[in-house]
A protein has these predicted regions:
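Conserved AdoMet/S-adenosylmethionine-binding subsite of the radical SAM
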Residues: 1-104
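C-terminal accessory regions of radical SAM enzymes
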Residues: 95-130
Length: 130
């Protein structure tokens, strides 16, 4: 195997953009500088009540990210942290939003719906019963 030809050799950075309104010229310029050096940029979005809890909003975000050469990678349920419960969405509601999103986007623009469970080594995929 040649060095530099496998996925493990690609430098990856994960950003956290929750709404397409966050992507301005400064952000696109920074992403472009990263991708021009061969860095792959992935995005993790947190599903937030009142911010991005509609499939159309999330679809617009995925499309905008893709336009900037960013892969929409994870759609997180909110971690239970003090002072943020007003942003929380139930797993059932998140699954409903996700099913709508699946009907709006091609697979390569569809992030994985996940949650972090304390003590688990990796993210847990949320079933959507599709």
């Amino acid at each position: 195997m040649e060095i530099g030809n496998c996925a493990e050799d690609i430098v990856k950075i994960q950003c956290k953009i929750n709404h397409s309104n966050e992507i301005d010229n400064q952000v696109t310029s920074a992403i472009e500088r990263l991708t021009n050096t061969g860095i792959r940029v992935l995005n993790q979005t947190v599903l937030l009540k009142g911010v991005n809890d509609h499939a159309a909003t999330l679809a617009a975000l995925s499309e905008r990210l893709f336009d900037c050469a960013v892969t929409p990678y994870y759609l997180h349920l909110l971690d239970p942290v003090q002072g943020a419960s007003h942003f929380d969405i139930t797993s059932d509601h998140a699954s409903q939003i996700y099913r709508e999103l699946q009907n709006m986007l091609p697979g390569f623009l569809l992030p994985k719906l996940v949650r972090e469970i304390p003590g688990k080594l990796s993210k847990t995929i949320i079933p959507t019963d599709v």
